[in-house]
Amino acid sequence: GFNLLIDAGSATLIKLQEHLDPLDLDAVILSHYHHDHIADLGVLQYYWQLHPKRNPETLLSIYGHTKDSIHFEELTMENVSKGHPYFEAEELKIGPFLITFMETIHPVVCYAMRIVEETTGKVFVFTGDSGYLESFADFAKDADLFLADTYLFEGNEHHHAHFTSKEAGELAKSANVKKLVLTHLPQFGDLEQLKNEAQKAAGKGIDVELAAVDKVFNI
C-alpha cells in the first residue's frame, strides 16, 4: 500500500507509531501551516534523520503550498526530506492518488483536498480548515468520505475560519456525499449534539460520524 499522512498536528507521531513505522510513510501533505496542523512535522523529520535503520538515500516527500515561503522552505531538510509545491490550478499525482485543491476561508492560506484513488475511483475530500463556502458543494460532489472541519455548533454560521455543524451537514447534502465525518471538534459542549445537528442538516440518507483517535474509515 501507499502511506500518505495528511497534516501533522500535535501528538500525530506518537499515535502514528502505534499503527505504522514512520519510516514507512511514503509522503506527507499539508493543508496549511497553523501549528495544530504541523506541530509534529519537525519531530517527524528528526525521526527520519536519526533513525539508524533509515535508508539514507530515501528522502521523505512533504507537499505544501508556497504562499508562505518561510514555512514551505522548512519542509526541506538536507538528507532527510524534500518539500514539493502544490497549486490550486494543477492536479497533483502522489502514488496511487490524484489530488486537486481549493483555497478555503481561513486566517491563513489553506487548501481543501479532493483525493481520488485512480484504480477504484473512490473519492475522499478533506476541507482543511475553512469557513462556509458554497463551492464545497461542487468540490466534494459524490465523495465517498467527506471529512469536514466542524468546530462550531449551530447558531454560529458564517464564521471566518470554521464550519458549524449545520453548515457541514448542508454541504454534505448538497454534495451528495456518502459519509460525513466531523473533525476539528470543539473542546467544549456536547459532541453528540454537534453530530445530531449535522445529521439533521444532512438528512437521513447520509451517515454522519465524529472523528476520533484510532478510528478507521474504510472507503
Q: What annotation goes with each model-predicted range?
A:
Residues 1-20, 110-128, 145:
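Conserved beta-strand hairpin/beta-sheet module of binuclear metal-dependent hydrolase folds
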Residues 3, 10-59:
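Active-site metal-binding motif and surrounding structural segment of the metallo-beta-lactamase
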Residues 5-9, 26-32, 36, 65, ...:
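Active-site neighborhood of phospho(di)ester-bond hydrolases with catalytic His/Asp-centered motifs
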Residues 9-11, 80-86, 125-131, 162:
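Short gly/ser/thr-rich secondary-structure transition/capping motifs
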Residues 40-48, 73-74, 190-198:
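Metal-dependent catalytic neighborhoods of phosphoester/phosphodiester hydrolases
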Residues 54-110, 118-119:
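Metallo-beta-lactamase
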Residues 93, 114-116, 216-218:
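Short, well-ordered beta-strand micro-motif
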Residues 132-217:
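Cap/insert and terminal regions of metallo-dependent hydrolase folds
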